[in-house]
Amino acid sequence: MYFRAIIFYFIFIMACTTNNESSASTEIPLRSEIDSKYKWDLTSVFESDEAWEVELDRVKNLYPNMSEFKGKLLSNPETLLSSIRLDEEVNMSLGKLWHYASNSLNADLTNEKYQEMVQRVRNVWIKYGAVTAYYTPEMLESDYSVLEGFMNENSELKQYEKVFKDAYIAKPHILSEKEEKLLTMAGKLSGVSNEAYDIMRATDFEWGSFKDENGKELTMSPGRYGKYTKSTDRRVREDMYKALYVPFKNSLNTMSVLMKGNVEGNIFYANARGYENSLEAKMKGSGISTDIYKNLIKSVNNNLQPLHRWAEIKAKTLGIEKIKPFDTYAPLADFTIEYTYEEAQKIVVDALQPLLQANEGELQKFTEKMYNENLIDVFENKGKESGAYMSSTWDLPPRIKLNYAGTLDDVFTLAHELGHAYH
């Protein structure tokens, strides 16, 4: 019952954080129907899927070499540095492989080829984790003063000081080599719930439909939530909201089990590493006390009155008795403004002029590069992952995924993701 209850919260969060649609057409367009200028180009990562295969084969032959450092990791500074350099090379390669495969898949989650490619990269990463399971336990067998001495002898190691310190802070939760290897191998199972949910939502969900302000029937999708939740017509907002939840309601039992699996996975790893609970495992790994988390929730709960007052004022302004979830983003004015993607680009540039001109126009050049070199995937298409994100990896320009629908929030999202990309 607990999981059936919290699944509603999970669904609501998913809906509220998704972005928007590419057009006002009845059906969501296929990816092939989207103009190429609005789609990211991944050929600068790998020229083709075949080139991706070549690099995957290379790293599969490379990563076993990490086993050569076992038993002599801290024999001298040069050996430690060599191990770090090899680890960086492997992770840079895997990051590049993941960047290509995962972004290709997220553009269309129904693509079975990219589903397989993502899984293959994940499998190599897990195998690499098993090969390097000895690494941290072996390092922690020595006192930290050994590493301090190494850093004094070889200045190139100094740049990894924080990595070393973090490892020693986590020492109480680092297991033996054998146990670390088992946990790494179990990692393949930990992501099954999330993967199953993503594929189910992209391929198996049968969305409801609703009629817009003009009576035109539209097929619902997560991408349409952002636009129609801001409709001035309450009937449209309510019908859209109900249509959004049709597939979730039909899959409630399945989703409850998937979420249960995700939660139990977190509990398993927390217990295995000797944390008090999964909350401590998540917080302590980032150097944050669980008290901060709990105090934040307590503080919010103790100061909800302004939010309740806002809801009362908004309900009164909208002329309704009580605000409901689909009224949360309703505009107070009786009209809405839509912005083309090109208008959004200009608005962002105009708004950021003082920043864009700093440092000899560095940010200006960066923004133009993002706009002009197919580094942004703009509109929703069938199978595309909902929401927005910025994706980056070593030695490659970042990429941004949107589901742009022309709302002011979409303009803000573009600016937000550009900020992540520049950072």
What do these predicted ranges mean?
Residues 340-364:
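Carboxylate/His-rich catalytic cores and anion/metal-binding grooves
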Residues 337-339, 376-396:
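Catalytic zinc-binding patch centered on the HExxH motif and its immediate surroundings
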